[in-house]
Amino acid sequence: MPDLRQPFEARPEWFVLIDVGLARGLDPAQALETLFAEAFEAGLVSDGIVAQNDAQRHQFWEVREQMPEANRRIGSVSSHDISVPLGLVPEFIRRADAHFGTMGDIRINCFGHLGDGNLHYNIFPAQGRSKAEYVTRRDEIKRAVHDISHDLGGSHSAEHGIGRFSLFEQYQGG
């Protein structure tokens, strides 16, 4: 989204948006700063920003909330709303990225609700290419995403319902 202000100057490979609510008297900024410091020391993060006010907090959330619209404008080859057990989210991403890395020129957009294991894992044409060039591979792409999700004990269906009944039958023995 061209008019959307990004929180980081240099765009990182991954963003994690954390919104906390704490008991009265506790300082959320201090809690997040402690979290960032520990994560940085452990090599888990390279940068972090704590919202300084509600306007900045809303600005951070706007980046996340505009992702579906940005995806729609670009035009995905194949979009997925899947779930995997929370502890296996990194494994799903590793396996799926490795699988689709063999396909050549594609872009992947993965975002979701990491607190509950729901992911939107979307495949897009490479920059400057048309999604029509990939239409013959759409079923193969969908099958791979669903297979990886199910292999990890997840589902082809997350927050937006059960999806197509045929998939429910295929993976649940309908």
Predicted regions located by residue number:
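Noncatalytic alpha-helical scaffold of FAD-dependent oxidoreductases
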Residues: 1-174
